[in-house]
Amino acid sequence: MAEPVLVVGLGNPGPQYATTRHNAGFMVVDILADRMGEKFKVHKKSGAEVATGRLAGRPVVLAKPRVYMNESGRQVGPLAKFYSVAPADVVIVHDELDIDFGRIRLKAGGGVAGHNGLRSVASALGGNDFQRVRVGIGRPPGHKSGASFVLENFNSVERKEVPTILEQAADATELLVAQGLEPAQNTVHAWG
C-alpha cells in the first residue's frame, strides 16, 4: 500500500476566523474533504481535526489544526509521526501575502517569508522539506499591517471570486498529490 500524504490546511479555529484570509487553508481542505465524501473528526493523539480517504488514487490524511495558526506545528508534528508521513509527503495549504490575490502557486522547501504558521510547522517537522499550496491573498492596501490584513474577511469584490479560487486551490492540491511537484507546477502556474 502506498504511503499516505498528509495535507494540512492552515488557519485559526473558531467562527470569528472562519471567513478570514488567514483561513484559506482550512477552506481548501474542507473542499477536499467534501470531494472525498469524508467528514472531519478530532484525532485524539494530536488534537487536530482529520479526515482520511483517497485523493487522486492515493491514501490521504486531511488535517486542520485546532490551535492558533502560529502554533500549528504542535499538532502537525504528532500527526506526521502517527501516520508515518515523511516531511516530503506533507502538503501545507496556506494563504500567501507575497502572491497576488487569486493566484495559486506550488512550492517545496524554501524560507517561510515571515509566515509564523509555516515557521511552526518547519520547527515541528525538523526542517522545511514539506510541499506547499500557496493561495495568493495579495498585499494589504496602503500602510495597513499584514498581521491585521490576514485576520480580516475578504472584501466584497474578493468574495465574488473566492469560491472559484478555493476550488482551483483544491484542484492544484489534487494535482500535486497525483503527479508530484514539477508536473503539477507546470500545470498550475500556467493558470496565471
Curated annotation (Swiss-Prot):
Transmembrane segments: none annotated. It comes from the Bacteria. Gene3D superfamilies: Peptidyl-tRNA hydrolase (3.40.50.1470). One of its GO terms (cellular component) is cytoplasm. It is found in: Cytoplasm. TRNA binds at Y17, Y68, N70, N116. The record marks D95 as: Stabilizes the basic form of H active site to accept a proton. GO terms for molecular function: peptidyl-tRNA hydrolase activity; tRNA binding. Its EC number is 3.1.1.29. The active site is at H22 (proton acceptor). InterPro entries: Pept_tRNA_hydro, Pept_tRNA_hydro_CS, Pept_tRNA_hydro_sf. One of its GO terms (biological process) is rescue of stalled ribosome. The record marks N12 as: Discriminates between blocked and unblocked aminoacyl-tRNA. The keyword tRNA-binding applies. Keywords: Cytoplasm, Hydrolase, RNA-binding, tRNA-binding. It catalyses: an N-acyl-L-alpha-aminoacyl-tRNA + H2O = an N-acyl-L-amino acid + a tRNA + H(+). Hydrolyzes ribosome-free peptidyl-tRNAs (with 1 or more amino acids incorporated), which drop off the ribosome during protein synthesis, or as a result of ribosome stalling. Belongs to the PTH family. This is Peptidyl-tRNA hydrolase. It comes from Mycolicibacterium vanbaalenii (strain DSM 7251 / JCM 13017 / BCRC 16820 / KCTC 9966 / NRRL B-24157 / PYR-1). The lineage of its organism: Bacteria, Bacillati, Actinomycetota, Actinomycetes, Mycobacteriales. The gene is pth.
